[in-house]
């Protein structure tokens, strides 16, 4: 076989790069030695399309590999000096495939040679996917001064600067609302905290530029004018965002407190932002690794602040333990608004994704503490379009499933103890449902046309609550649609689905309950779910998300209908089916 031929064995990364793979684990030794992300040996990745997405992934791996080679050859004698500069990228560099020197003077160029650009692929983290820790991110010490911050010049005499301003405005006005369609800060002024973080965090700045460039690319036709140049800009901004985030995370290994950075909770905010960037690029494994890193940063942030003497805390440096609540003392701070927003996005996605993956979130204990705070959970409604308490029974059911599996493995499962735990979770749901049910019934009587945004969020919460009932009893009884509690909860969930106007159904918010209940539907229940899907396929903004969910639900139906008595219910469990189809609901 010639070296130019595509290899048919080995990990997906080596096959893409046409390298010999030793197939000796994940990451394989070849990927580990070159410092690139190992995509493993599982089902064909979503980027493997023999087209543009495959070329983009190859280019991304090439950028990282070349950066590592440059670093190995470098003499680490230079340092960064001078005032912080506006982050910008030299778009005139002749080496289009190598990491660029972004917004740096001649004395700054060594940072791309003395530090690793590999962090965001985190090959070391890939080998311990379900038990990530910040300690395993091994990087060289970053430059001694603070990273560049966005400066607003008085004269726009620079074409590159105008490009960046255009992309930043596109992010604030178009991309952020598209990514977070449930966020209730609908006007640009209500999103002014974004500019604050963009100005103070270079990692957030470059990641936002990358996201903006990505969505611009998605709106351009194949072969459109300027597409190639924009793709190169996207790759360069992304490379810089990875480097800046590497600096940020590596600072956590230093003796000083990891929260004493330029922005409160910066590693949380930027970790979530980069996870979203990887998700829209369909690098789902990398996205989850960064989400896990952000979760650990959040846990570390809260653990550190809880031990500090509140009398010595400065509002500009170290936040108190109430940093994520509605404490009026901090409500007006733009940095705290950003931290609350991205922490909620993190918790929401991490819990639901881990539920789909049948794993326990790395920061589960931190989430439990936050979700027990009645001043914190109301914040979810305005950010994700659903009340935050619905995550409590979901997380508790995940912990129950883990406990049950462990007890069964030991041969020590007590049915009485199992039922006691189930009763506790049901009581959480029951107490909340007593408040929800009358309000939803009034909406049913009033009709769809009279619903306000607050009423829509109430219906979302009601649907989630009944999906949680189904989820809980699936843990106890397996994926069995005939179980009375499962069948009844699906019926009540469907009644609420029909209260939502098709144009207002947000499948980014509702992906989890749709899969939980839709996958277990039988008979007339399926007809109603099919109606929901067909009505929403007319809405092009949700069709790609819905296509993923539709594939999972219909595969579950097919497997259930052709089941045999001795067949395991796992064949029509939506979580198992989603894994086999290589799909994800993370940042869907």
From Swiss-Prot:
Its main location: nucleus. It is found in: Nucleus. It comes from Aspergillus flavus (strain ATCC 200026 / FGSC A1120 / IAM 13836 / NRRL 3357 / JCM 12722 / SRRC 167). This is ustiloxin B cluster transcription factor ustR. InterPro entries: Fun_TF, Zn2-C6_fun-type_DNA-bd_sf, Zn2Cys6_DnaBD. The keyword S-adenosyl-L-methionine does not apply. GO terms for cellular component: nucleus. Transmembrane segments: none annotated. Residues 68-92 are annotated as: Disordered. The gene is ustR. Disruption phenotype: Impairs the production of ustiloxin B and its intermediate ustiloxin F.
């Amino acid at each position: 076989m010639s070296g130019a031929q595509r290899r048919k064995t080995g990990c997906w990364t080596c096959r893409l790069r046409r390298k010999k793979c030793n197939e000796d684990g994940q990451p394989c030794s070849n990927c580990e030695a070159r410092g690139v992300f190992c995509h493993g040996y599982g089902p064909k990745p979503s980027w493997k399309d023999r087209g543009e997405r495959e070329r983009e992934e190859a280019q991304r791996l090439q950028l990282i590999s070349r950066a590592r080679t440059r670093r190995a050859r470098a003499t680490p004698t230079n340092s960064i000096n001078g005032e912080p500069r506006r982050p910008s990228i030299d778009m005139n560099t002749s080496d289009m495939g190598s990491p660029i020197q972004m917004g740096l003077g001649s004395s700054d160029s060594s940072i791309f040679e003395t530090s690793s650009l590999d962090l965001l692929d985190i090959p070391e983290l890939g080998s311990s996917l379900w038990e990530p820790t910040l300690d395993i991110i091994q990087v060289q010490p970053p430059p001694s001064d603070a990273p560049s911050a966005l400066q607003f010049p008085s004269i726009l005499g620079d074409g590159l600067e105008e490009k960046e301003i255009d992309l930043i405005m596109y992010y604030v006005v178009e991309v952020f609302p598209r990514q977070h369609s449930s966020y209730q800060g609908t006007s640009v002024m209500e999103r002014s905290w974004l500019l604050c973080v963009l100005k103070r965090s270079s990692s957030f700045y470059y990641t936002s530029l990358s996201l903006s460039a990505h969505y611009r690319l998605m709106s351009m036709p194949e072969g459109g004018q300027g597409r190639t140049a924009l793709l190169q800009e996207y790759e360069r901004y992304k490379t810089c965002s990875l480097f800046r985030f590497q600096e940020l995370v590596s600072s956590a290994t230093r003796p000083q407190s990891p929260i004493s950075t330029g922005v409160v909770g910066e590693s949380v905010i930027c970790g979530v932002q980069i996870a979203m960037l990887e998700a829209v690029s369909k690098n789902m494994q990398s996205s989850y690794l960064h989400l896990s890193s952000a979760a650990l940063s959040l846990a570390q942030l809260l653990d550190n602040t809880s031990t500090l003497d509140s009398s010595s805390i400065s509002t500009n440096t170290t936040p108190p333990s109430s940093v994520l609540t509605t404490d009026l003392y901090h409500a007006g701070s733009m940095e705290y608004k950003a931290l609350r927003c991205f922490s909620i996005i993190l918790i929401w996605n991490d819990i639901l994704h881990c539920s789909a993956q049948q794993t326990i979130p790395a920061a589960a204990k931190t989430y439990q503490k936050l979700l027990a705070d009645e001043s914190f959970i109301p914040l979810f409604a305005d950010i994700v379009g659903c009340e935050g308490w619905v995550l409590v029974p979901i997380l508790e059911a995940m912990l129950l499933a883990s406990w049950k599996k462990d007890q069964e493995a030991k041969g020590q499962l007590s049915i009485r103890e199992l039922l006691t735990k189930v009763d506790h979770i049901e009581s959480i749901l029951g107490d909340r449902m007593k408040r929800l049910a009358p309000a939803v019934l009034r909406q049913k009587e009033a009709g769809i046309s009279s619903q306000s945004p607050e009423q829509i969020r109430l219906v979302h919460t009601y649907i989630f609550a009944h999906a949680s009932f189904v989820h809980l009893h699936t843990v106890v009884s397996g994926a069995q649609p005939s179980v009375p509690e499962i069948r009844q909860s699906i019926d009540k969930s469907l009644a609420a689905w029909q209260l939502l106007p098709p144009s207002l159904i947000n499948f980014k918010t509702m992906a989890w309950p749709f899969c939980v209940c839709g996958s277990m539907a039988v008979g007339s229940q399926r007809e109603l779910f099919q109606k929901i899907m067909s009505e929403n396929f007319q809405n092009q903004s949700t069709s790609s998300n819905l296509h993923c969910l539709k594939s999972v639900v219909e595969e579950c139906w097919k497997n259930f209908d052709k089941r045999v008595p001795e067949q395991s219910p796992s064949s029509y469990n939506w979580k198992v089916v989603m894994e086999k189809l290589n799909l994800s609901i993370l940042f869907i």
